[in-house]
Amino acid sequence: MIYDLFCNFAPMKQCCLIILMICSLTVSAQQERTWEEVWQEMMTPEDMDETEETWEDYYERLQQLADHPIDLNHTNREDLEQLPFLSAQQVMDIMEYLDRYRPMRSMNELKMVRSLDYQQIALLPFFVYVGEVVREEPHFPSLQNITKYGKHTVMATGHVPFYERKGDQDGYLGYRYRHSLRYEFTYGNYVKAGIIGAQDAGEPFFANQNNTGYDTYSYYIQLKKLGILENAVIGKYKIGAGLGLVLNTSFKLGKLATLQNMGRQPNTLRAHSSRSEGDYFQGAAAIIRLCKPLTLTTFASYRPIDATLNDDGTASTMITSGYHRTIKEMEKKHNTHLSAFGGSIGYRQGGFHLGANAVYSSIDRTLCPNTKTTYRRYYPQGDNFLNTSLDYGYTHYRFAINGETALNKDGALATINTLSIQASGDLSLVAIQRFYSYRYNGLYAHGFGNTTRTQNESGIYLGVTWQPLAHLHLQGYADYAYSPWPRYQVSQASHTWDMLLQSTLKWQKWSLQARHRTRLQQKDDDNKNMLIPSNEHRTRLSIAHTSDAGWTSKTQADYVYTVYKEVSQGWMVSQQTGYQHATWQASLSLGYFDTDSYASRIYLYERQLQHEFTFPSYYGNGLRLALYAQVSLNDHLRLATRLGYTNYFDRSSIGTGLQEIAQSHTTDLDLQLRWKF
């Protein structure tokens, strides 16, 4: 048994350190990293406690782009703007290069675009490619060609836990296994259609008030370049406008990732192809090209949602977790309906753009949050909501100015304005100013800020990316925010500072990265009479090495120090090793952690199955082990599996409530089979 190997605490510490040292000394690296490994260097996973669904959606979008990369020899500005890690200047520079030198012959030509830094150069090959120079179809393809030459993908994924939670024995309506099934059909960049069925562990399957099989389904048909119809989706979809003050169900990037796209908000209409049950529309949407500089975007949606109800039948809160495992959770399933319609009209000429946006939504139960709690007083209330805005901007090859100013139906104001400067090929700067009135609210507003709510915040963000030497890359930001109205755990006006500095040194096959982040916040004391500091410091050091032999290796050390009422600190050391062959690949992740409490938890990236997003955190004292393997059985079939094992040395049980596991260790197995034809 795996457990027998790790049952003793003291020997395990020595064993972990020995294994980590051996791995770091003996393993080289891989032929090519995955896009997930590059992407996680741009993440601040500690923000995911409040924005996990946003990060999951970001991951799913990148996965879709990786599955259907963009042909640089047959692309346009709108296609490149789908890539959320590119700034407006970088999109412009790539298009100018293509206009001058297309057709491209090699991906190495991207190095000629000076505004692209090493992270974009590392990410782009996963999402774009240099295709053959062939004449594009002069019009939308015929139904005969679509059905004859279209590509099909079927993917089945299952999660098997080798343990039982308390709810699996009594409390959950379903079994402990999690699984999903997805089908997608594509024809070039013209047609995409699919359906996804998914359920979480504990949810019933063809049983207990769930007669449709999976707990949740997503379905869509997307058409592009159909005459004046640039993009259209029927089914479930996501859409954005401006900088997200009125409408953004698509992206909300973290502050570190903002340094990559220089504050640009990627506003695209796209199919909702993930298992997430939050922030999507259901109905139809379209982008229509009225004339070359003028586009019209319109949408309509009607969808069921989960809600917590008050005694009088009104809705207290809208729930987006998507869990329907217990009788109480099942009673809340789709007990309320939300409708919405709206759109935007945009003008773009040269580098200038101007847009007007409006969203109207209504709910069939009056929304009545508990406003006796002061910080909820200005949460959305009522049964209908209206938000309008103007977005504006100008893009030059050296700088870009963008902004959006919005009003809700009560006249409350929200505004955000960005300035990004490409001072040289080695230096870029970004500044973001925001003011969100504490009376402003919007059901679909997700603007840049400290929290998930675009409300009760004003601040300034300053970021810099600098490459002082050929092999040295520096990034940093400082963000200050002021909240004049009480927030959760904050009973009066408060201030927040968030600062990060990251350096990356690359030399031949080696990469050394150091990161430090400090967050200085204010929260209530025990008596809620005054605010006291709530500070957090996170430091990470990592070293990676690559070689042409197919191996990969990365050694990482994390340290966390937090202060709020009491001091909590912790550390973790981890090693990731991988090998990539022409038809198969495998990776091993091993980590040892020792933290005082949940406040000093540490996040660890692990290789995941396709379309499965997790970024687990660990606290206490224990060991984490994960093994990933993938093999191409033939040109059409691919099998992937992941085995995870966690052993805690400081407790006899894991979790609380119905999630409690009556043992100190867990083992999980994930399986995935993909069939493309």
Feature-to-residue mapping (PLM):
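Outer membrane beta-barrel
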Residues: 212-306, 427-441, 585-598
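Amphipathic, charged-and-aliphatic alpha-helical interface segments
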Residues: 55-107, 124-129, 199, 203
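Exposed, low-structure sequence patches enriched in small/polar residues
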Residues: 172-176, 281, 336-369, 377-677
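Cleaved targeting-peptide boundary
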Residues: 30-38
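Outer-membrane beta-barrel proteins
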Residues: 198-216, 270-277, 331-334, 406-408, ...
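Transmembrane beta-strand segments of Gram-negative outer membrane beta-barrel proteins
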Residues: 141-169, 185, 189-195, 232, ...
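Hydrophobic h-region of N-terminal signal peptides that target proteins for export
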Residues: 20-28
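Alpha-helical interaction/regulatory segments in DNA maintenance proteins
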Residues: 49-63, 92, 100-103, 111-148, ...
